Amino acid sequence: MYDSSSKIKDLSLAPFGKLQMEISETEMPGIMTIREEYEKLKPFKGAKITGCLHMTIETALLIETLQKLGARIRWCSCNIFSTLDYAAAAVSTLENVSVFAWRGETLEEYWWCVEKALTWGENGEGPDLIVDDGADASYLVHKGAEYEKLYEEKKILPDPESGKNEEERCFLSLIKSSILKNPKKWTNMAKKIIGMSEETTTGVLRVKKIEKNNGLLFTAINVNDSVTKQKYDNIYGCRHSLPDGLMRATDFLISGKIVVICGYGDVGKGCASAMKGLGARVYVTEIDPICAIQAVMEGFNVVTLEEIVEKGDFFITCTGNVDIIKLEHLLKMKNNAVVGNIGHFDDEIQVSDLFNHEGIEIENVKPQVDRVTLPNGNKIIVLAQGRLLNLSCATGHPAFVMSFSFCNQIFAQLELWENRNTGKYEKNKSYILPKELDEKVAFYHLKKLNATLTELDDNQCEFLGVSKTGPFKSEAYRY
């Protein structure tokens, strides 16, 4: 039944969304196995879960699974361009599920959606648990509580005009408005949140920064560093969805072209592999000597951006850092160069500086594709305004890969909920899921690919010092 409190683009898209969900079920064996094992037990009975994660078909199946396991849910997307409106429509019809997401939100609308997903009652009551991607929901709670304390002690409100960009101004404006309505909303909310689970490298970095400053207000589980998330979603997911996004956006041939991959972490490895497989000449920029030598050993040229900026045909950022491709680089690019980002946030490329630069002409070619005429007459193509091109110009990672990531999210949420009164997890610390669960997630997906495990005999188990059921590797093992 549709929850009238939801805000989506078009409810009539729900039947198509449900059909897509049904098709994707066969490609998400881990998610479906969890349903079979836990649905009758209803382990999330009584739990209120807020999600801030790309509202795709795969996410719709995650939401439906959490709902079938007994949770009540409020959900928003974590990117203004990544929502698939038919997916949002489909899940909005589920019982005990409210959705606040549509494709093409403004930044003001985006943060409104995040606040709505976090707010469970008229008095500002919040969730028990947060499923996060980029840590935006958790960040809002933390910064809201921080500014409430400042207001309580010094009567100082956040100044939206002090924001360094439009998004920060919208963010500060929301918190200011919230404090004027309810000056203890975020503080009280944080006290009752059991914990959050974070999906991305960038989000984990945010959480770690807060933790380092002793500011973490509730438990955090780092899903990103589970092997079955990091090595599958980050590598194989990007290897599929980067070329998908580039082809849908540009229809340009990749074979023979010069592709510059900025960053050679797991995401960069997947991107470089995809481009190499399509016949591109791949160049990598890196700051880390270990990652750099890995790139060289895979046959890639490791250069500085300054060396290659005037020659590249495609530039892809995937560093999780800021200001990787600066305005000065963009202005030097060759005619028809394509610039895109597959890192979580939009600050890897100085798109805003480019769009506001004197002498620039911007022509929207189609949704999330802009052709920019530079002062020297060259035209470059900017994808998704520097936001995630694989989710903005295409539909993101395939369902099979997301099944791994979302199994980890569910197990993280279960760990937090089932141990809420045991003292296993401290309030102000972050954790990684146990290796047993990592191996369990991998096991769930073997049958779908017709893979059969070899079983150790007793003598082999004794020699290795492991049990027949695992875990098979130490925590220090690097896959």
Swiss-Prot record:
Keyword annotations of the record: Hydrolase, NAD, One-carbon metabolism
UniProt: NAD(+) binding residues: 200-202, 234, 263-268, 286, 321, 342-344, 390
Binding residues for substrate: T56, D133, E199, K229, D233
NAD recorded as keyword: yes
GO cellular component, one term: cytosol
Pathway(s) this gene product operates in, as recorded in its UniProt entry: Amino-acid biosynthesis; L-homocysteine biosynthesis; L-homocysteine from S-adenosyl-L-homocysteine: step 1/1
CDD domains with a match to the protein in the record: SAHH
InterPro entries: Adenosylhomocyst_ase-like_sf, Adenosylhomocysteinase-like, Ado_hCys_hydrolase_NAD-bd, NAD(P)-bd_dom_sf, S-Ado-L-homoCys_hydrolase_CS
Pfam annotation, one family: AdoHcyase
Enzyme superclass (EC): hydrolase
Catalytic reaction(s) noted: S-adenosyl-L-homocysteine + H2O = L-homocysteine + adenosine
Record's cofactor remark: Binds 1 NAD(+) per subunit.
Cofactor: NAD(+)
Gene Ontology biological-process annotations: one-carbon metabolic process; S-adenosylmethionine cycle
GO molecular function: adenosylhomocysteinase activity
Signal peptide from the UniProt entry: none
EC number: 3.13.2.1
Oligomeric and partner information: Homotetramer.
PANTHER family in UniProt: ADENOSYLHOMOCYSTEINASE
Job of this protein: Adenosylhomocysteine is a competitive inhibitor of S-adenosyl-L-methionine-dependent methyl transferase reactions; therefore adenosylhomocysteinase may play a key role in the control of methylations via regulation of the intracellular concentration of adenosylhomocysteine.
Family: Belongs to the adenosylhomocysteinase family.
The protein's name: Adenosylhomocysteinase
Naturally occurring in which organism (per UniProt): Plasmodium yoelii yoelii
